[in-house]
Amino acid sequence: VSEEYTVKRESYDWYTSLDQIRTSTSDPVPASVSVTIALGYKKEDKAASTEITERRIEIIDFLRRFFSEQTVEDLKPQNEEIIRQQIRDQINDDILSNSRIRDVRFTGKDVVQQ
């Protein structure tokens, strides 16, 4: 691959101090959901780090509610990119006001049907 076609992916600092989120899906027979999420923000963006820390409880509450509104079908691995984008956009639009997260990654994700 020639150099001009190589896209350098931006690297991020990661906020990893969110608690593990545990909830149930919205299916008629709910499944258990357990996720651990890391939020990526621009390197050296102290404002993002500070605001995420200040709004940590709101973010955890949002994530718990978000996953409790999903179905097992919604949470399938092939939908993870969409879920990550939805989480990023909703945190940026509804929770953060002075900064932006750039990426969301699952560091753990289990969906267990009863």
Name each model-derived stretch.
Residues 1-114:
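Flexible, low-complexity charged segments
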